[in-house]
């Protein structure tokens, strides 16, 4: 209760604090004058003191009350006024967004930019009737007027990125003229035109993002110019035609259009509208005014398979699942059909179909089957009933899921702890692809709610493979799973946290307890992620244990019966094919948690006794962990030992065998010094004798041996005179034998020309006989054979040729066929004579013995008979014509012949044609009846029906219609309808239409309602419901008079607010884009590469959405290899010098000026070390010779004659001061500026004299002064000045330097600075002074070093020309004493070292101001250092003009840190990261001045 009251108390304080704020006096008076001039007393009432509490009404800066944000002013006059708003009325206010409503506006306000700080101007005034000049350069300009008419030139909008022109009068409008020059068409991005009379031609406008076009009711359809739509090349085109005009649906669009919204009253198409060629279109929205735009109840368009469809307020009767009658949809599309009359039940899904459907606001009934589980289905506000499938119920605790099914009558739509029994995700890890694969059932689709543990993380969001059933995520390449065995995933819906294995691993229990009631509890790992994830079985001894619960790390089960407790029992856990065995004690309550060494190596080698932690090794294995192999012979004799690594006896050199019981004798060595010559030869180590293989011989098997073939007589080479060569293994036969074994006799066949069998046969040397080849004969195969068997006895074979010579009465090659001649051997040239029969074979068109007679076939009837058969039908084969009998007709005599009715011997009475096939008359158009003797008169025809059909009748003899009770007229074409209630006496009834024509002031079907007017007649954005007086706004139009425009995303991505004047989102700081979904990205630090090229790292804010990312360094593309929300890694080629860097994504570009500096391989030294040292070109530092010092070795190191410096801190100004003699050097942090990309100063914070001392810390080493001041209500800047009491080394970005005693170290912290734009940057100004004190020098011997009052000498050359080793030097010399300033060219930006540039802001005779260009960072750490030294012109003895010069070592090191403080957090997180080659901002010695004499007084810079 106390906390509650405290909270209310603080709210009260905050409220009163807000009310107490007032604008600065000049702004107060400016707004007061405006309120007074225009009498705005209602919105701005006076308070009790007679003044105004402006900041309680308009937006004021909560710190200083300045009206520097959004200002909206509205006239309170209800009648026309002559008081005009002019530019000077409000130019005294610093707002950045102005909205003027219903004032009389001066035209100069439109064309002159009076409000310099303003970027957005909106005017709603009917005093604007035309736009005749170029509008003032406000980036966003809105003009709303009911009297804005005529032709508007696009050249008048060349200064705008966003333009909104609205004529809210539905009876008039304007057109657009494309007259701008090409170079002036680039800037316009978001045009919004309302009240158009035709589609504008936007040829040449290439930067359009999301234009919108609203057309007036006054447009003429004939001059609408729909063809111009294809000139609108934009990411998204929106066209809204009025509901009062019917137009053809446009069919031609620009190829670059990705998103299309079109609203109108479209004519009913007669054919499908093919938009499939517009393959770049990703989404098309069709917003209907009536129900006609369909074909047979289907969406009448055909799109590409990549175009999403959004259709609303139409008439679609068929629920489309996989497509329509015109097109098959793809899985890449989403389908939305809202408020369009869909009815019936949702059919089950099958096949390849889209995975997104939105059927909200229809009349779909029935249940939702589980076939819809793997789709994104939305059925809000339908008539569905029954139970939702478990795949949906599991995720109803997610409000985004639940709202998809509200507005129905589902019985299980429970959003709090919904029952879930089917949730079963499965995980697979592919280490080669560094990918986690998620499959399973009913795990949902809300990937952002799948959270991995810290072991793993997805580089990006989960990637869909198959919607609802297969997703993958890739973990970073730097992550290794070699040592990761498992990990967990937290599924926010349905609220389950599961641990999954990353490897295949047997169950690993580490604790097993048998409890009461035969329960068993097992703890460990690699069991089952949940019951059913793997197949599990558990047994203890021979008793099964039924699993009750299971997770990755525990199992509970119940034994079927009590186990024995006398001895340890074997526990067996099986998961899929993996088995784990262990022996346990089954004593109730005993914890078997003793793990064995190395888990007994493996399940095949041993089993662990988990009651005492010892292994029971399986047969063949030995050792504490069963890792050793038992020898096959337990005792190795003759001094042998058992090697348990391999399980074999190791014998000494004179013994062998498994148990070392046999002696060992070596056999002789042969070829290649191998025992028994190696190869397949073997040695008998017991006898020492070689046993050669079949191919070798000899004592050491070194001689080859090949056996010859053995003959049938079992003799080698068959014995006799045959011989064998054992070296080659080949037999050599004598002259009377042959064959590989010489076993066959050899007999020569007959020869011809010394060739056996004449070369035409095969000789059988065993018999001496020839076997002739086919076609040859005789004993020596020298003759030829005939093809027949001795010419069949009808001829003689000529063996010299192999041809039959037939006798005269025979023919053919074998003389087998008799020869007969025809009567006419030529067959009249119409056939062929067959000599085998002597008969002519005629062709198809002739006949007869000699083929001399023509032949024509008669037609064949349907009964397959010539001339249809019958006795009376005759065929003439010479003419091919049938002659029919009297009862048949037709060419094939297949048709009956029937006579028609005849009168006066004239068929059909002479008024018709007789059909002898049917015997019926076809009367002419003027006669009727069977014999055509009655006259025929036609009745009137309407709708292609005689007398309009229905129950109307026609008298064809008179030609007169007789109408039924519901029709009238000569053709019965007019309905007869009475009006309901006779129009209630408030109108006139048309009985033909049954429609009432109401009197003025009445409406309704029966004139039963009076007319109520709507506000502003619904502007042009809706239809008036004159019954209720309420506007029904068109889609994307809002407010009670439909005057407002709804943004594409009304919530603006939850990162902005919708401006209903133009339908555009006003994004929160840090977001951009039409729907505010993109972060306003920027880079805060860059780690460059060497001049040879390589990997570049960019850190900053880039968000989760990175469409078409691109990085440019100067003019070179840096190829992106990886991108996250806060870093980019890219690869660039070689280059050199300082470059701009740009990061482009999501269509927006960010540029960092001079932010990239290639790392040099070699560095030069300042002034080449003045020949007083050696240059270290790796670091760019001088290594001075003895006696010299300084960054360029131009100072002497002798310091014993110099008085010490005195460091101080001014507690009022926070200035660091070092005094030395009469000289005072002062270092101040004076200004912080927020600068634009074009280097303009947007904001400036004067830091000088505004510091507040917080604390002084003094100890033996240091003395620290802490100051701070507020920059805005949410950011501050603090400064610490530390007086160094002992020498010490400071490291900054891998750069080391020494801070000497009596130095001052300055640290600056800029906390939580909020930039006005992501392209802006901060510039910090540091000022250094040198001047005289009023002290009298006690070192008179050095008076010759005092100047004569002349100015100090300042050199800032290196600062302006930074080319040396990351260090810039500025020096101030006074009385030969030097304030030496070194500025490093790197800062630590948000924890990362990055390059910065610096420049001289101002320089006069005794001071210099340096500006450090900080990156767009939240935390910046800058580290310049300052030193007071002696010039080489300093004289040790004034009498000796040639004496050596000395240096006073007094150093001031300044560290400026921007460690941003997170608002509302008690934790300060600071992170430093250093890289090679830091920027050093150094002070350089200027030219020497040898003037002497007494000090003429102080010179203040």
UniProtKB/Swiss-Prot annotation:
Induction of expression: Down-regulated by Pseudomonas aeruginosa, PAO1 strain and up-regulated by PA14 strain infection.
Glycosylation (residues): 47, 64, 169, 192, 255, 315, 397, 453, 470, 497, 612, 635, 643, 685, 693, 700, 726, 765, 835, 843, 877, 916, 956, 991, 1017, 1122, 1270, 1309, 1334, 1437
Record's bilayer topology term: Single-pass type I membrane protein
A Pfam family it matches: EGF_TEN
Disulfide bonds: 631-642, 636-649, 651-660, 786-797, 791-804, 806-815, 822-833, 827-840, 842-851, 900-914, 908-921, 923-932, 979-989, 983-996, 998-1007, 1047-1058, 1052-1065, 1067-1076, 1165-1175, 1169-1182, 1184-1193
InterPro entries tied to this protein: B-sand_ComC_1st (IPR057014), B-sand_ComC_2nd (IPR057015), ComC_SSD (IPR054484), EGF-like_comC (IPR053331), EGF-like_dom (IPR000742), EGF_extracell (IPR013111), IPT_dom (IPR002909), LRR_ComC (IPR057013)
Name of the protein in question: EGF-like domain-containing protein comC
Originating species: Dictyostelium discoideum
């Amino acid at each position: 209760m106390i906390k509650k009251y405290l909270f209310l108390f603080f709210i009260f304080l905050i409220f009163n604090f807000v009310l107490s704020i007032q604008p600065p006096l000049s702004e107060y008076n400016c707004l007061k004058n405006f309120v007074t001039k225009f009498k705005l007393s209602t919105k701005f009432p006076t308070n009790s003191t007679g003044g105004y509490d402006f900041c309680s009404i308009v937006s004021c800066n909560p710190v200083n009350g300045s009206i520097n944000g959004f200002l909206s002013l509205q006239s309170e006059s209800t009648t026309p006024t002559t008081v005009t708003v002019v530019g000077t009325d409000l130019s005294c206010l610093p707002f950045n967004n102005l909205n003027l409503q219903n004032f009389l506006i001066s035209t100069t306000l439109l064309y002159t930019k009076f409000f310099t700080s303003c970027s957005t101007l909106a005017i709603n005034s009917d005093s604007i009737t035309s736009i005749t000049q170029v509008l003032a350069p406000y980036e966003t300009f809105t003009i709303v007027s009911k009297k804005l008419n005529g032709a508007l030139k696009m050249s008048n909008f060349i200064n705008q990125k966003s333009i909104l022109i609205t004529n809210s009068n539905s009876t008039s409008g304007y057109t657009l003229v494309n007259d701008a020059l090409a170079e002036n068409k680039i800037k316009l991005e978001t045009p919004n035109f309302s009240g158009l009379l035709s589609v504008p031609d936007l040829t040449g406008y290439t930067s359009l993002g999301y234009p919108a076009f609203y057309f007036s009711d006054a447009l003429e359809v004939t001059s609408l110019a729909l063809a111009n739509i294809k000139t609108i090349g934009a990411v998204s085109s929106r066209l809204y035609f009025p509901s009062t005009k019917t137009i053809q649906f446009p069919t031609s669009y620009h190829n670059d259009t990705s998103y299309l919204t079109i609203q109108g009253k479209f004519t009913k198409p007669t054919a499908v509208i093919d938009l499939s060629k517009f393959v770049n279109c990703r989404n098309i929205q069709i917003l209907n005014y009536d129900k006609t735009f369909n074909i047979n109840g289907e969406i009448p368009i055909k799109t590409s398979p990549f175009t999403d469809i959004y259709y609303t307020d139409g008439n679609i009767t068929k629920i489309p699942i996989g497509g329509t009658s015109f097109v098959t949809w793809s899985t890449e599309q989403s389908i939305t059909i809202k408020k369009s009359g869909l009815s019936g039940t949702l059919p089950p899904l099958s096949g390849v179909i889209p995975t997104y459907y939105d059927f909200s606001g229809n009349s779909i009934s029935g249940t939702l089957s589980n076939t819809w589980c793997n789709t994104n289905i939305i059925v809000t506000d339908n008539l569905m009933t029954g139970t939702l499938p478990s795949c949906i119920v599991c995720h109803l605790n997610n409000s985004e899921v639940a709202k998809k099914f509200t507005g129905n009558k589902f019985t299980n739509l429970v959003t709090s702890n919904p029952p879930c029994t089917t949730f079963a995700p499965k995980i697979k890890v592919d280490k080669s692809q560094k990918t986690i694969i998620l499959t399973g059932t009913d795990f949902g689709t809300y990937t952002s709610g799948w959270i991995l543990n810290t072991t793993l993380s997805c580089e990006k969001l989960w990637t869909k493979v198959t919607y609802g059933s297969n997703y993958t995520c890739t973990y970073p390449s730097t992550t290794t799973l070699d040592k990761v065995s498992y990990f967990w995933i937290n599924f926010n819906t349905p609220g389950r946290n599961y641990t999954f294995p990353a490897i295949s691993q047997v169950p690993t229990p580490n604790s097993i307890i048998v409890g009461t009631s035969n329960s068993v509890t097992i703890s460990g790992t690699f069991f089952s992620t949940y019951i059913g994830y793997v197949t599990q079985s558990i047994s203890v001894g021979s008793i099964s244990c039924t699993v009750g619960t299971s997770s990755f790390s525990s199992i509970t089960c119940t034994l079927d019966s009590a186990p024995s407790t006398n001895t340890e029992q074997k526990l067996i856990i099986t998961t899929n094919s993996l088995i784990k065995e262990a022996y346990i004690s089954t004593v109730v309550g005993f914890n078997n948690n003793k793990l064995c060494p190395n888990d007994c190596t493996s399940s095949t080698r041993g089993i662990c006794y988990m009651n005492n932690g010892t292994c029971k090794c399986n047969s063949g294995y030995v050792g504490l962990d069963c890792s050793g192999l038992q020898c096959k012979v337990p005792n190795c004799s003759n001094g042998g030992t058992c090697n348990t690594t391999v399980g074999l006896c190791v014998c000494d050199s004179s013994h062998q065998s498994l148990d070392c019981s046999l002696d060992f004798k070596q056999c002789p060595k042969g070829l290649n010094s191998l025992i028994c010559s190696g190869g397949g030869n073997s040695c008998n180590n017991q006898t020492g004798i070689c046993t050669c293989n079949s191919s070798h011989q000899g004592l050491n098997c070194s001689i080859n041996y090949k056996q010859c073939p053995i003959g049938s007589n079992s003799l080698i080479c068959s014995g006799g005179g045959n011989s064998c060569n054992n070296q080659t293994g080949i037999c050599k036969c004598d002259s009377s034998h042959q064959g590989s074994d010489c076993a066959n006799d050899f007999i020569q066949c007959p020869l011809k020309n010394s060739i056996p069998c004449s070369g035409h046969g095969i000789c059988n040397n065993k018999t001496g006989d020839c076997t002739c080849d086919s076609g040859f004969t005789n004993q020596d195969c020298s003759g030829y054979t005939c093809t027949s068997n001795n010419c069949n006895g009808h001829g003689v074979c000529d063996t010299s040729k192999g041809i039959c010579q037939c006798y005269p009465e025979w023919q053919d090659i074998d003389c087998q066929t008799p020869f007969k001649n025809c009567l006419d051997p030529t067959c009249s040239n119409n056939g062929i004579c067959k000599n085998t029969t002597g008969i002519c074979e005629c062709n198809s068109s002739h006949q007869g013995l000699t083929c001399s007679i023509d032949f024509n076939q008669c037609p064949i009837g349907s009964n397959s008979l010539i001339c249809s058969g019958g006795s009376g039908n005759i065929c003439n084969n010479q003419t091919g014509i049938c002659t029919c009998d009297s009862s048949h007709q037709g060419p094939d005599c297949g048709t009956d012949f029937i006579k028609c009715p005849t009168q006066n011997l004239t068929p059909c009475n002479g008024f018709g044609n007789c059909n002898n096939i049917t015997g019926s008359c076809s009367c002419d158009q003027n006669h009727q009846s069977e014999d055509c003797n009655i006259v025929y008169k036609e009745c009137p025809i309407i709708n292609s029906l005689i007398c309009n059909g229905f129950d109307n009748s026609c008298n064809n003899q008179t030609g007169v219609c007789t109408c039924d009770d519901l029709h009238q007229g000569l053709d019965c074409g007019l309905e007869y309808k009475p009006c309901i209630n006779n129009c209630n006496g408030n109108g006139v009834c048309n009985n033909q239409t049954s429609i009432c024509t109401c009197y003025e002031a009445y409406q309704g079907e029966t004139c039963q309602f009076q007319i109520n007017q709507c506000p502003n007649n619904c502007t042009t954005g809706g239809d008036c419901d004159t019954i209720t007086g309420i506007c029904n706004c068109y889609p994307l139009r809002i407010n009670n008079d439909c005057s407002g425009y709804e943004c594409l995303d009304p919530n603006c991505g939850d990162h902005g607010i919708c401006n209903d004047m133009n339908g555009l989102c006003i994004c929160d700081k840090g977001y951009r884009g039409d729907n505010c979904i993109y972060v306003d990205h920027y880079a805060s630090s860059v780690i460059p590469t060497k001049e040879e090229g390589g990997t570049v790292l960019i850190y900053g804010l880039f968000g989760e959405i990175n469409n078409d990312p691109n990085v440019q360094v100067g003019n070179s593309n840096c190829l992106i290899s990886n991108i996250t929300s806060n870093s980019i890694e890219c690869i660039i080629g070689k280059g050199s010098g300082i470059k701009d860097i740009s990061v482009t994504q999501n269509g927006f570009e960010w540029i960092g000026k001079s932010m990239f500096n290639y790392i040099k391989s070699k560095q030069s030294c300042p002034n080449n070390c003045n020949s007083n040292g050696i240059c270290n070109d790796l670091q760019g530092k001088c290594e001075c010779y003895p006696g010299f010092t300084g960054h360029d070795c131009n100072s002497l190191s002798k310091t014993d004659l110099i008085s010490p410096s005195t460091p101080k801190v001014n507690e009022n100004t926070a200035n660091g001061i070092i005094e030395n003699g009469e000289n005072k050097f002062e270092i101040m942090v004076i200004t912080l500026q927020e600068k634009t990309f074009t280097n303009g100063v947007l904001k400036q914070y004067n830091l000088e004299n505004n510091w507040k001392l917080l604390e002084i810390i003094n100890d033996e080493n240091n003395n620290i002064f802490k100051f701070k001041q507020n920059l805005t209500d949410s950011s501050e800047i603090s400064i610490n000045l530390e007086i160094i009491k002992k020498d010490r080394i400071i490291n900054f970005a891998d750069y080391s330097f020494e801070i000497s005693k009596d130095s001052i170290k300055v640290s600056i912290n800029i906390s939580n600075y909020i930039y006005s734009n992501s392209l802006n940057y901060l510039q910090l100004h540091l000022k250094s002074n040198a001047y005289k004190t009023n002290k009298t020098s006690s070192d008179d011997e050095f008076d010759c070093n005092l100047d004569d009052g002349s100015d100090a000498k300042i050199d800032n050359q290196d600062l302006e020309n930074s080319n040396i080793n990351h260090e810039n030097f500025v020096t101030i010399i006074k009385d030969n004493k030097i304030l030496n300033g070194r500025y490093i060219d790197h800062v630590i930006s948000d924890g990362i070292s990055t390059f910065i540039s610096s420049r001289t802001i101002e320089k006069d005779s005794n001071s210099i101001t340096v500006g450090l260009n900080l990156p767009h960072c939240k935390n910046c750490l800058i580290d310049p250092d300052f030193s007071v030294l002696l010039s080489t012109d300093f004289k040790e003895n004034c009498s000796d003009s040639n004496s050596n010069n000395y240096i006073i070592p007094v150093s001031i090191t300044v560290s400026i840190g921007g460690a941003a403080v997170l608002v509302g957090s008690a934790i300060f997180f600071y992170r430093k990261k250093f890289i090679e080659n830091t920027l050093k901002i150094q002070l350089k010695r200027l030219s020497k001045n040898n003037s002497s004499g007494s000090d003429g007084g102080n010179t203040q810079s």
